[in-house]
Protein backbone atom coordinates (compact mmCIF):
# COMPACT_ATOMS: atom_id res chain seq x y z
CA UNK A 1 0.00 0.00 0.00
CA UNK A 2 1.50 3.31 -1.01
CA UNK A 3 2.47 5.62 1.82
CA UNK A 4 1.20 8.56 -0.18
CA UNK A 5 -0.03 9.23 -3.68
CA UNK A 6 2.53 11.96 -4.22
CA UNK A 7 5.30 10.66 -1.99
CA UNK A 8 8.70 12.21 -2.50
CA UNK A 9 10.92 9.61 -4.16
CA UNK A 10 14.47 10.05 -5.38
CA UNK A 11 14.35 10.57 -9.16
CA UNK A 12 17.25 8.15 -9.55
CA UNK A 13 15.50 5.46 -7.53
CA UNK A 14 12.28 6.00 -9.42
CA UNK A 15 13.76 5.73 -12.89
CA UNK A 16 16.64 3.28 -12.51
CA UNK A 17 14.69 0.09 -13.14
CA UNK A 18 12.79 1.58 -16.08
CA UNK A 19 15.89 2.94 -17.77
CA UNK A 20 17.88 -0.24 -17.18
CA UNK A 21 15.14 -2.36 -18.74
CA UNK A 22 14.79 -0.01 -21.69
CA UNK A 23 18.52 0.14 -22.33
CA UNK A 24 19.00 -3.62 -22.18
CA UNK A 25 15.93 -4.32 -24.28
CA UNK A 26 17.21 -1.92 -26.91
CA UNK A 27 20.42 -3.95 -26.98
CA UNK A 28 18.50 -7.16 -27.63
CA UNK A 29 18.84 -8.56 -24.12
CA UNK A 30 15.83 -10.28 -22.57
CA UNK A 31 15.30 -8.57 -19.24
CA UNK A 32 11.72 -8.97 -18.06
CA UNK A 33 12.30 -12.23 -16.20
CA UNK A 34 10.62 -15.47 -17.10
CA UNK A 35 7.78 -13.74 -18.93
CA UNK A 36 10.09 -12.63 -21.71
CA UNK A 37 10.67 -16.24 -22.79
CA UNK A 38 7.52 -17.80 -24.21
CA UNK A 39 7.33 -21.52 -24.80
CA UNK A 40 4.39 -23.74 -25.58
CA UNK A 41 6.35 -26.98 -25.34
CA UNK A 42 4.41 -29.27 -22.99
CA UNK A 43 6.28 -30.09 -19.81
CA UNK A 44 5.24 -32.19 -16.81
CA UNK A 45 7.41 -30.08 -14.52
CA UNK A 46 6.41 -26.83 -12.91
CA UNK A 47 8.56 -23.78 -13.24
CA UNK A 48 10.82 -23.23 -10.23
CA UNK A 49 9.56 -21.31 -7.24
CA UNK A 50 5.96 -20.20 -7.05
CA UNK A 51 3.87 -17.70 -9.02
CA UNK A 52 4.04 -14.09 -7.81
CA UNK A 53 1.12 -12.65 -5.91
CA UNK A 54 0.10 -9.16 -7.03
CA UNK A 55 -2.73 -7.94 -4.82
CA UNK A 56 -3.34 -4.21 -5.15
CA UNK A 57 -5.41 -2.66 -2.38
CA UNK A 58 -5.02 0.94 -3.46
CA UNK A 59 -5.43 3.33 -0.53
CA UNK A 60 -7.55 1.00 1.60
CA UNK A 61 -6.70 1.01 5.31
CA UNK A 62 -9.50 -1.18 6.70
CA UNK A 63 -8.77 -4.27 8.79
CA UNK A 64 -9.29 -6.61 5.85
CA UNK A 65 -6.82 -4.68 3.72
CA UNK A 66 -4.24 -4.68 6.50
CA UNK A 67 -4.60 -8.44 6.89
CA UNK A 68 -4.21 -8.98 3.16
CA UNK A 69 -1.11 -6.77 3.14
CA UNK A 70 0.43 -8.80 5.97
CA UNK A 71 -0.32 -12.05 4.18
CA UNK A 72 1.08 -10.80 0.90
CA UNK A 73 4.27 -9.67 2.64
CA UNK A 74 4.67 -13.12 4.17
CA UNK A 75 4.08 -14.75 0.79
CA UNK A 76 6.67 -12.53 -0.88
CA UNK A 77 9.18 -13.35 1.86
CA UNK A 78 8.88 -17.07 1.20
CA UNK A 79 6.52 -17.92 4.05
CA UNK A 80 3.46 -19.23 2.17
CA UNK A 81 2.12 -21.38 5.01
CA UNK A 82 1.80 -18.41 7.37
CA UNK A 83 0.40 -16.31 4.52
CA UNK A 84 -2.17 -18.99 3.75
CA UNK A 85 -3.40 -19.01 7.34
CA UNK A 86 -4.23 -15.31 7.09
CA UNK A 87 -5.70 -15.56 3.60
CA UNK A 88 -7.96 -18.40 4.75
CA UNK A 89 -9.63 -16.02 7.21
CA UNK A 90 -10.40 -13.46 4.49
CA UNK A 91 -13.63 -14.19 2.57
CA UNK A 92 -12.88 -11.56 -0.07
CA UNK A 93 -11.90 -12.49 -3.61
CA UNK A 94 -8.37 -11.26 -2.86
CA UNK A 95 -8.25 -13.61 0.11
CA UNK A 96 -9.40 -16.56 -1.98
CA UNK A 97 -6.82 -15.86 -4.68
CA UNK A 98 -4.10 -15.50 -2.06
CA UNK A 99 -5.13 -18.74 -0.34
CA UNK A 100 -5.04 -20.61 -3.65
CA UNK A 101 -1.50 -19.48 -4.44
CA UNK A 102 -0.27 -19.92 -0.86
CA UNK A 103 -1.09 -23.63 -1.22
CA UNK A 104 0.98 -23.90 -4.43
CA UNK A 105 1.06 -26.31 -6.11
CA UNK A 106 -1.55 -28.26 -4.13
CA UNK A 107 -4.75 -27.75 -6.18
CA UNK A 108 -3.85 -24.10 -6.70
CA UNK A 109 -4.60 -24.17 -10.41
CA UNK A 110 -7.92 -25.97 -9.94
CA UNK A 111 -8.98 -23.48 -7.26
CA UNK A 112 -8.14 -20.53 -9.48
CA UNK A 113 -9.98 -22.10 -12.41
CA UNK A 114 -13.04 -22.49 -10.19
CA UNK A 115 -12.77 -18.85 -9.12
CA UNK A 116 -12.51 -17.81 -12.76
CA UNK A 117 -15.64 -19.78 -13.60
CA UNK A 118 -17.50 -18.02 -10.83
CA UNK A 119 -16.04 -14.58 -11.57
CA UNK A 120 -15.48 -14.54 -15.35
CA UNK A 121 -15.02 -10.76 -15.49
CA UNK A 122 -12.56 -10.42 -12.61
CA UNK A 123 -9.19 -9.09 -13.75
CA UNK A 124 -7.78 -10.05 -10.34
CA UNK A 125 -8.67 -13.71 -10.85
CA UNK A 126 -7.73 -13.85 -14.54
CA UNK A 127 -4.31 -12.31 -13.87
CA UNK A 128 -3.43 -14.86 -11.20
CA UNK A 129 -4.94 -17.74 -13.16
CA UNK A 130 -2.59 -16.73 -15.97
CA UNK A 131 0.36 -16.78 -13.59
CA UNK A 132 -0.57 -20.25 -12.34
CA UNK A 133 -0.96 -21.49 -15.92
CA UNK A 134 2.38 -20.01 -16.88
CA UNK A 135 4.07 -21.72 -13.93
CA UNK A 136 2.48 -24.93 -15.15
CA UNK A 137 4.07 -24.51 -18.62
CA UNK A 138 0.68 -23.82 -20.21
CA UNK A 139 1.85 -20.63 -21.86
CA UNK A 140 -0.83 -20.18 -24.51
CA UNK A 141 -3.57 -20.57 -21.90
CA UNK A 142 -1.73 -18.13 -19.64
CA UNK A 143 -1.66 -15.51 -22.39
CA UNK A 144 -5.38 -16.05 -23.00
CA UNK A 145 -6.09 -15.48 -19.31
CA UNK A 146 -4.03 -12.29 -19.31
CA UNK A 147 -5.92 -11.04 -22.35
CA UNK A 148 -9.16 -11.62 -20.46
CA UNK A 149 -7.77 -9.68 -17.48
CA UNK A 150 -6.73 -6.77 -19.69
CA UNK A 151 -10.08 -6.62 -21.50
CA UNK A 152 -12.57 -7.43 -18.75
CA UNK A 153 -11.61 -4.68 -16.30
CA UNK A 154 -9.22 -2.36 -18.14
CA UNK A 155 -9.46 0.34 -15.46
CA UNK A 156 -7.71 -1.75 -12.80
CA UNK A 157 -4.10 -2.35 -11.76
CA UNK A 158 -4.63 -6.04 -12.53
CA UNK A 159 -5.32 -5.24 -16.17
CA UNK A 160 -2.20 -3.07 -16.27
CA UNK A 161 -0.14 -5.92 -14.82
CA UNK A 162 -1.60 -8.42 -17.26
CA UNK A 163 -0.59 -6.13 -20.11
CA UNK A 164 2.97 -6.18 -18.75
CA UNK A 165 3.12 -9.94 -19.24
CA UNK A 166 1.57 -9.73 -22.71
CA UNK A 167 4.12 -7.09 -23.76
CA UNK A 168 7.39 -8.05 -22.05
CA UNK A 169 9.51 -5.77 -24.25
CA UNK A 170 7.84 -2.70 -22.80
CA UNK A 171 8.73 -1.22 -19.45
CA UNK A 172 6.36 -2.48 -16.74
CA UNK A 173 3.29 -0.46 -15.89
CA UNK A 174 2.21 2.62 -17.82
CA UNK A 175 3.90 6.02 -18.14
CA UNK A 176 2.58 8.48 -15.58
CA UNK A 177 2.09 12.12 -16.50
CA UNK A 178 4.21 14.57 -14.48
CA UNK A 179 2.61 18.02 -14.32
CA UNK A 180 4.89 21.02 -14.63
CA UNK A 181 3.10 22.49 -11.61
CA UNK A 182 3.07 21.15 -8.06
CA UNK A 183 0.35 19.52 -6.04
CA UNK A 184 -0.63 21.96 -3.26
CA UNK A 185 1.09 21.25 0.04
CA UNK A 186 -2.27 21.09 1.83
CA UNK A 187 -3.05 18.01 -0.29
CA UNK A 188 0.39 16.40 -0.16
CA UNK A 189 0.34 16.25 3.65
CA UNK A 190 -2.95 14.34 3.76
CA UNK A 191 -3.15 10.55 4.18
CA UNK A 192 -3.48 8.76 0.84
CA UNK A 193 -7.20 8.04 1.04
CA UNK A 194 -7.91 11.69 1.88
CA UNK A 195 -5.65 12.86 -0.94
CA UNK A 196 -7.71 10.92 -3.44
CA UNK A 197 -11.00 12.23 -2.07
CA UNK A 198 -9.82 15.85 -2.06
CA UNK A 199 -8.36 15.56 -5.56
CA UNK A 200 -11.58 13.98 -6.84
CA UNK A 201 -13.68 16.80 -5.38
CA UNK A 202 -11.34 19.43 -6.81
CA UNK A 203 -11.48 17.80 -10.23
CA UNK A 204 -15.28 17.72 -10.18
CA UNK A 205 -15.57 21.38 -9.26
CA UNK A 206 -12.36 22.94 -10.56
CA UNK A 207 -10.48 23.61 -13.74
CA UNK A 208 -7.96 21.89 -15.98
CA UNK A 209 -5.10 21.74 -13.48
CA UNK A 210 -7.31 20.10 -10.85
CA UNK A 211 -8.34 17.47 -13.38
CA UNK A 212 -4.71 16.87 -14.35
CA UNK A 213 -3.68 16.33 -10.73
CA UNK A 214 -6.53 13.90 -10.15
CA UNK A 215 -5.74 12.11 -13.40
CA UNK A 216 -2.11 11.67 -12.34
CA UNK A 217 -3.26 10.27 -8.98
CA UNK A 218 -5.54 7.82 -10.79
CA UNK A 219 -2.59 6.71 -12.91
CA UNK A 220 -0.60 6.01 -9.75
CA UNK A 221 -3.53 3.92 -8.51
CA UNK A 222 -3.62 1.80 -11.67
CA UNK A 223 -6.78 3.28 -13.16
CA UNK A 224 -5.70 4.32 -16.67
CA UNK A 225 -9.15 4.70 -18.22
CA UNK A 226 -10.37 7.01 -15.47
CA UNK A 227 -7.14 9.00 -15.74
CA UNK A 228 -7.57 9.27 -19.51
CA UNK A 229 -11.05 10.74 -19.00
CA UNK A 230 -9.75 13.37 -16.57
CA UNK A 231 -6.94 14.37 -18.92
CA UNK A 232 -9.31 14.59 -21.88
CA UNK A 233 -11.64 16.82 -19.88
CA UNK A 234 -8.70 19.05 -18.95
CA UNK A 235 -7.71 19.40 -22.61
CA UNK A 236 -11.25 20.34 -23.56
CA UNK A 237 -11.32 23.02 -20.87
CA UNK A 238 -7.88 24.41 -21.68
CA UNK A 239 -6.89 23.61 -25.28
CA UNK A 240 -4.13 26.22 -25.16
CA UNK A 241 -2.51 24.74 -22.05
CA UNK A 242 0.45 22.51 -22.99
CA UNK A 243 0.14 20.52 -19.76
CA UNK A 244 -3.49 19.69 -20.50
CA UNK A 245 -2.81 18.71 -24.10
CA UNK A 246 0.28 16.66 -23.23
CA UNK A 247 -1.56 14.89 -20.41
CA UNK A 248 -4.40 13.98 -22.76
CA UNK A 249 -1.87 12.43 -25.14
CA UNK A 250 0.01 10.51 -22.44
CA UNK A 251 -3.29 9.21 -21.08
CA UNK A 252 -3.91 7.49 -24.42
CA UNK A 253 -0.79 5.31 -24.15
CA UNK A 254 -1.72 1.68 -24.65
CA UNK A 255 0.75 -1.15 -25.15
CA UNK A 256 -1.56 -2.70 -27.73
CA UNK A 257 -1.51 0.52 -29.78
CA UNK A 258 1.12 3.09 -28.73
CA UNK A 259 0.47 5.10 -31.89
CA UNK A 260 -2.65 6.63 -30.33
CA UNK A 261 -0.52 8.52 -27.83
CA UNK A 262 2.33 9.37 -30.19
CA UNK A 263 -0.01 10.69 -32.87
CA UNK A 264 -1.35 13.21 -30.36
CA UNK A 265 1.88 14.05 -28.54
CA UNK A 266 4.28 14.42 -31.48
CA UNK A 267 2.42 17.28 -33.23
CA UNK A 268 2.39 19.26 -29.98
CA UNK A 269 6.08 20.00 -30.56
CA UNK A 270 4.99 22.40 -33.30
CA UNK A 271 1.98 23.70 -31.37
CA UNK A 272 3.98 24.38 -28.19
CA UNK A 273 7.63 24.63 -29.32
CA UNK A 274 8.81 26.02 -25.97
CA UNK A 275 6.78 23.75 -23.67
CA UNK A 276 9.15 21.49 -21.75
CA UNK A 277 6.36 19.08 -20.89
CA UNK A 278 5.95 18.00 -24.51
CA UNK A 279 9.59 17.03 -25.08
CA UNK A 280 9.86 15.42 -21.67
CA UNK A 281 6.83 13.19 -22.06
CA UNK A 282 7.74 12.29 -25.61
CA UNK A 283 11.06 11.06 -24.24
CA UNK A 284 9.26 9.19 -21.48
CA UNK A 285 6.97 7.36 -23.89
CA UNK A 286 9.90 6.46 -26.13
CA UNK A 287 11.79 5.13 -23.14
CA UNK A 288 8.78 3.01 -22.20
CA UNK A 289 9.07 1.34 -25.59
CA UNK A 290 12.85 0.83 -25.20
CA UNK A 291 13.52 3.34 -27.97
CA UNK A 292 16.56 4.56 -26.06
CA UNK A 293 18.32 6.59 -28.76
CA UNK A 294 15.25 8.64 -29.62
CA UNK A 295 14.28 8.96 -25.95
CA UNK A 296 17.70 10.35 -25.09
CA UNK A 297 17.40 12.98 -27.81
CA UNK A 298 14.02 14.19 -26.52
CA UNK A 299 15.12 14.16 -22.89
CA UNK A 300 18.20 16.21 -23.72
CA UNK A 301 16.05 18.74 -25.54
CA UNK A 302 13.67 18.86 -22.57
CA UNK A 303 16.52 19.41 -20.14
CA UNK A 304 18.03 22.13 -22.32
CA UNK A 305 14.79 24.11 -22.18
CA UNK A 306 15.24 24.58 -18.42
CA UNK A 307 17.36 22.20 -16.34
CA UNK A 308 16.23 23.81 -13.06
CA UNK A 309 12.53 22.92 -13.29
CA UNK A 310 11.09 19.69 -11.83
CA UNK A 311 10.75 18.27 -15.36
CA UNK A 312 14.29 19.38 -16.20
CA UNK A 313 15.59 17.62 -13.12
CA UNK A 314 13.64 14.46 -13.97
CA UNK A 315 15.06 14.53 -17.49
CA UNK A 316 18.56 14.85 -16.01
CA UNK A 317 17.87 11.86 -13.75
CA UNK A 318 16.81 9.70 -16.69
CA UNK A 319 19.86 10.73 -18.70
CA UNK A 320 22.19 10.06 -15.76
CA UNK A 321 20.83 6.54 -15.34
CA UNK A 322 21.15 5.91 -19.08
CA UNK A 323 24.83 6.80 -18.79
CA UNK A 324 25.27 4.60 -15.72
CA UNK A 325 23.95 1.51 -17.50
CA UNK A 326 26.34 1.95 -20.37
CA UNK A 327 24.36 3.76 -23.07
CA UNK A 328 25.67 6.85 -24.79
Say what each PLM segment does.
Residues 65, 94, 124, 157-161, ...:
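Start-of-helix register in tetratricopeptide repeats
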